Amino acid sequence: AMRARSVDRPPVWFMRQAGRSLPEYREVRAGVPMLDACLDPALAAEITLQPVRRHGVDAAIFFSDIVVPVKCAGVDVVITPGVGPVVAEPFAAQSDLARLPAPTPDMFDAVAAGVRTTVAELGATPLIGFAGAPFTVASYLIEGGPSRDLPRTKAMIIREPELFSALLGRLADLAAAFLRAQILAGASAMQLFDSWVGALPARLYREHVLPHSERVFAQVADLGVPRVHFGV
């Protein structure tokens, strides 16, 4: 279906199918911080598999979080229950870019190991890998946490467009490397999530955000898997 071919029925999966709605998820996550669970290959695989076993969905979605790439890159970020991602030192200046190094070959080894374990258990059920889009991840780094109106992010776009572009460029490279690690480990498709991009007017999106999302897709195009972009 993702390759636009005829199928007997539309495939069914849920965006957040692995998570708090499942009692088995709550059991294995008890006492384990979110990002620790994401970076534990065996636990990430188990959580990914849970909704497939329970509901028989047509695809698994790898258990991760959009801030995992920056966590692996060394950014001090935690996921606070009831709040979301919280960044200890928000990004505000050119010097902050040094805290986002270029991806290295082993940066996402734990994620790749989790994907391989998952794929080995899934059989014919495909696995969808994902990453956060550069803009949405940048909004957490700039705001320091969730923000509906994104005042600091919008201010950086308007007042310091070169800094904003440099930040999104680095995040695009991290997202692409994160996706490549998942695909090369066996993911059958990928999705890029831009869950805060709807806060921007269309002009700012086209000028300052879209090129960086396109950069992510360009860096995984050679792998030949279906690619999905989700933005609200």
Regions found by a protein language model. Give the residues of each.
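A gly/proline- and charged-residue-enriched helix-loop-helix capping module
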Residues: G82-E121, T125
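Active-site loop segments of alpha/beta catalytic cores
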Residues: M107-V232
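Short, conserved acidic/polar surface loops in the N-terminal third of protein domains
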Residues: K71-D76, P90, A138-E143
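Short glycine-enriched loops at secondary-structure junctions
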Residues: M15-R20, D65-V67, G82-V83, A131-S147
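Short glycine/proline- and acidic residue-enriched helix-loop micro-motifs
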Residues: A30-M34, A93-P103, I157-F164
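N-terminal basic, low-complexity leaders that serve as flexible interaction/assembly modules and, when applicable
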Residues: A1-C72, V77-P81
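A charged helix-plus-loop insertion that forms the helical arch/lid used to bind
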Residues: V78-A92, S147-K154
